């Protein structure tokens, strides 16, 4: 017969002991279990699908009821039982139309699955020496896009804290966007400092300031952040990808485009939801765009992106003055065509009222 180890004997003895003979620990209150059974809905068994157990799969029963107005001003998870007496928190965005997009849960899952690591996944050893003017142009664009990513991160962080917990799908997705932005800042800085160049000059930041100062509401910020600036950045990244000088740049721009596409999908979907669920929202968007188009026109005319992109497209300063600038102007035209099409989709016709400086890009 095998002999029990000392530890096994101790466990057995403890298990066989009568719990009534155990002395209570001095100063520790007897635990209460009156919280057990307090629930809005019990017995839920959500099963994983072919893609696993996804965030959107959990919207069943009471847990899937998403009200148009979230009355609770605490951090109570949606579907949990509320507790009386909890002091309110300053959640100023409590209407669904102020932040909602039906795609938020799916975009969250996609963002988690497609995260990438600049430190080890970018093929940095593919970088080769470029002509000085081209390297300077690439580094200037990295500087500019890094500022844009920082602006996106800051405005999201500002509004995310004001969004009610009842719409957690949006809050969770936007958390991934801030991480995307941080990753973009990281990889752009690494590209600028890894091939004999350096960071360029800070931009005037007219549109950045416009985005950061859009304090009327999250929807208003999204108009500037995604409908206007984001649509333009998509065209920039597409142009950079088509003109990448090496595998490292191809990896960077293609992965930034994937991330950016998620951001825009949420932004466009949210604006559509607001336009169809909030009376007068399209009129507000129209006013915002009238103001924003002026800042965008100034930045397109005077910003350093214009000449830097022309140099990249033209393979240098000489080529930038001709074919490079021609290609950049085509990029701006394509951006404006995208922008006007999106405005029509939202029910905001900007064809006739487009800012004259922007309209000139369509007439050339």
Label every model-predicted segment.
Residues 171-175, 251-254, 283:
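Short, charged, amphipathic alpha-helical segments
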Residues 191-206, 215-239:
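All-alpha helical catalytic cores of prenyl diphosphate-utilizing isoprenoid enzymes
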Residues 214-215, 230, 244, 268-290:
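Extended amphipathic alpha-helical segments with heptad-repeat/coiled-coil character used for oligomerization
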Residues 166-167, 245-247:
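Short loop-to-helix capping motifs
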Residues 145-153, 174-192, 223-234, 256-267, ...:
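Alpha-helical transition-metal enzyme core signature, strongest for iron centers
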Residues 212, 221, 244, 250-251:
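Active-site loop segments of alpha/beta catalytic cores
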Residues 152-214:
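Long, hydrophobic, well-ordered secondary-structure blocks that form the structural core
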Residues 2-171, 198, 220, 278-364:
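Terminal targeting/low-complexity segments that flank the catalytic cores of oxidoreductases
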């Amino acid at each position: 017969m095998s002999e029990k180890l000392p530890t096994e004997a101790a466990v057995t003895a403890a298990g066989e002991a009568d719990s009534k003979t155990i002395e209570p620990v001095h100063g520790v209150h007897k635990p209460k279990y009156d919280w057990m059974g307090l629930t809005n809905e019990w017995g839920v068994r959500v099963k994983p699908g072919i893609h696993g157990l996804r965030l959107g799969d959990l919207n069943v029963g009471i847990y899937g009821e998403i009200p148009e107005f979230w009355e609770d001003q605490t951090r109570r998870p949606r579907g949990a039982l509320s507790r009386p007496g909890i002091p309110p928190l300053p959640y100023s965005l409590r209407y669904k139309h102020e932040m909602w997009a039906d795609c938020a849960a799916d975009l969250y899952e996609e963002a988690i699955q497609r995260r990438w690591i600049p430190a080890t996944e970018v093929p940095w050893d593919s970088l080769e020496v470029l002509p000085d003017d081209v390297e300077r142009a690439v580094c200037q664009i990295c500087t500019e896009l890094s500022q844009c990513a920082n602006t996106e991160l800051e405005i999201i962080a500002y509004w995310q804290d004001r969004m009610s917990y009842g719409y957690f799908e949006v809050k969770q997705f936007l958390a991934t966007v801030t991480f995307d932005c941080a990753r973009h800042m990281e990889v752009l800085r690494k590209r600028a400092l890894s091939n004999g160049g350096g960071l360029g000059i800070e931009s005037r930041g007219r549109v950045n300031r416009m985005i950061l100062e859009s304090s009327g509401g999250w929807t208003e910020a999204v108009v500037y952040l995604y409908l206007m600036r984001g649509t333009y950045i998509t065209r920039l990244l597409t142009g950079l990808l088509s003109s990448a000088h090496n595998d490292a740049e191809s990896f960077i721009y293609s992965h930034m485009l994937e991330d950016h596409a998620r951001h825009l999908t949420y932004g466009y979907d949210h604006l559509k939801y607001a336009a169809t669920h909030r009376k007068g929202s399209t009129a507000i968007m129209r006013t915002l765009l009238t103001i924003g188009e002026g800042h965008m026109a100034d930045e397109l005319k005077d910003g350093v992106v214009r000449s830097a992109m022309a140099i990249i497209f033209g393979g240098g300063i000489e080529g930038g003055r001709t074919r490079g600038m021609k290609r950049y102007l085509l990029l701006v035209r394509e951006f404006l065509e995208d922008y006007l099409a999106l405005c029509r989709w939202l029910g905001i016709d900007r064809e006739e009222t487009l800012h004259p400086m922007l309209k000139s890009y369509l007439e050339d």
